[in-house]
Structure formats: C-alpha cells, structure tokens
C-alpha cells in the first residue's frame, strides 16, 4: 500500500547550510535520483510558523512517495541521499503517511493513491501544494501574517511546517491535527483568515496549479526539537478501542440471560408426560367388571325347567308336575 514520507532536517552551522544549498542545486540539475520512489521533491522552508516568503536557511526537507511502508522505511534508512542528509544534519525527523484522499495535480501529475480508511482517522495530516500565479503572489502573501498568527495560537495543531520548491510561487503547507473537525474549523471557519483566503483564491483565481491531500499517520522516525511530537499525538489520541468495549459488555449479558429461558420449557414438558403415563393404568377397571358377568350364571332361572339333568334322567316327571 502506497506510503509517503516527509523528512525534515535541521542544519545549524553555516558550513552545513552551504552544503545543503549545494545539494538542492545538484537536485535541480538532475544529479540526484531515488530509483524506488514514484515521486519525490526537495524543499526549503519559511521562517516563523513556516508559512512566510522569508526563507529559513536552517530547515530543509524531502518528500517521497514509495510503493509500500517497508520500502519507505528501508530507503529512508539506507538510501545514499537520506544517509548523507541525516549524517550532516543536527536533527532529522520523518513522518510516514498513507494517503486517504487527494484532489488536484502536482507538476501535472497525481502522485498520491488514496485508500479510504476503515474508520475515522485520528490524528489526521493535511498537505496543500499550490503554484501561485506570479502576478497574484503579492495578494497571496498579504494574507500570510493573519494566517500565521492564527495557526500559531491554535492549541489543536500537533505539528506544522511550510516548505517550498521555488520561493514565493511554489508553496507547500503540511500540518497535523487531532481530528478532521479541528482541521476543518481552522481551514474553513467562518470569518477566519484562512477561510477568507480560500474565498479569495476562488474568487480571484490565484493558483495556476493546486493539490490537496489528507493522510493517515503510520509512524515516525527520529526527533524534532528533541522530541517526537507526532508520535506523542499518536499515543495520546482518543482510543477508539474502549468505545466498542462497553457495547460487547452490554450485548453479552443479553444473550446469556435469554439462554436459560429455553431450559425451563423442556423441564415443564417432562412432568407432563410423567403425569399422563399412569392413565393407561385404567385397564384395571375392566378387571373389576369381569366378575359381574360371572354372577349371571349364578342367578340362572332355567334350573326349574328340569335343566339338562332332568331332561336326560326323567324327562316326563318333572314336566307333568309343572302342568298339574
């Protein structure tokens, strides 16, 4: 999955700053090459909050697009360009990013391949790149002081830097925020200097080319100003795992409570069968009635007629007495 790295380097000594200026010149002449990178750029930076036309000769950066995170980490650690810059710099810091959205072009290309995240991204990184029309540059930079003042006071912003390929006209801003809401409030807040600048850009068509991208943060390498500001934000971000935890806890008791309910039903059916089982024992009633037919032969009335003994022994005697 595509991975983007933004590496920033600080060169405190004058000789080191001269060295990095030579590196930038060599890059412009095509003497540098990153074979594994799909797209890459070298930048200078601005003073103050970073979003100014006045250069900061101490801070320089490299942005590169790699096929995957493994390649990105390996190249940042082993590529000759990165090794030279890291060795010469007093401080270096790399943020590894995964594009989640992108719109626009950079030098006529679409360098980022966004992948929609599975969940809300926190923290979130935003990058804007624009080529300002030369005759609009003065009006563009006139908006800068108010924007720098606003972002400098914003407690939500985790990290920010302004860099550029060509002074005054090719600018890149990079910032990291706790979430999309805080970023949107700064960028498009009603009446805010940044929101007003966006309106002016659209109304007066300041840009020759522009690109906007958002990223999920994969990790960091190194330190900046003696700490890892982005790594700290990743550690301190609102944990999304505990929120789902209460749901399963509430859901599990429900099935557990319903499970015993089927159990009483079978228990109730068994006694019913046990009660009905004795009913077939009613056949003893015919046993009681059996003697009744036996009493019928005892009360036999045909005996006075002579019965079978008189009929065989003395047939006429008994008959005559009956008639007399």
From Swiss-Prot:
Its EC number is 1.14.15.9. Keywords: Carotenoid biosynthesis, Heme, Iron, Metal-binding, Monooxygenase, Oxidoreductase. One of its GO terms (molecular function) is spheroidene monooxygenase activity. Its cofactor is heme. Could be biotechnologically utilized to produce more diverse oxo chemical structures. Disulfide bonds: none annotated. CDD domains: CrtA-like (cd21650). It comes from the Bacteria. GO terms for biological process: carotenoid biosynthetic process. Pathway: Carotenoid biosynthesis; spheroidene biosynthesis. Residues 248-278, 287-313 have a biased composition (Low complexity). The keyword Repeat does not apply. Binds 1 heme per subunit. It catalyses: spheroidene + 4 reduced [2Fe-2S]-[ferredoxin] + 2 O2 + 4 H(+) = spheroiden-2-one + 4 oxidized [2Fe-2S]-[ferredoxin] + 3 H2O; spheroidene + 2 reduced [2Fe-2S]-[ferredoxin] + O2 + 2 H(+) = 2-hydroxyspheroidene + 2 oxidized [2Fe-2S]-[ferredoxin] + H2O; 2-hydroxyspheroidene + 2 reduced [2Fe-2S]-[ferredoxin] + O2 + 2 H(+) = 2,2-dihydroxyspheroidene + 2 oxidized [2Fe-2S]-[ferredoxin] + H2O; 2,2-dihydroxyspheroidene = spheroiden-2-one + H2O. InterPro entries: CrtA-like. It is an enzyme of class 1 (oxidoreductase). Residues 226-324 are annotated as: Disordered. Involved in the biosynthesis of the carotenoid spheroidene. In vitro, can use nonnative substrates and produce oxocarotenoids with a hydroxy and/or a keto group, derived from neurosporene, lycopene, 3,4-didehydrolycopene or 3,4,3',4'-tetradehydrolycopene. Belongs to the CrtA family. This is Spheroidene monooxygenase. It comes from Cereibacter sphaeroides (strain ATCC 17023 / DSM 158 / JCM 6121 / CCUG 31486 / LMG 2827 / NBRC 12203 / NCIMB 8253 / ATH 2.4.1.). The lineage of its organism: Bacteria, Pseudomonadati, Pseudomonadota, Alphaproteobacteria, Rhodobacterales. The gene is crtA.
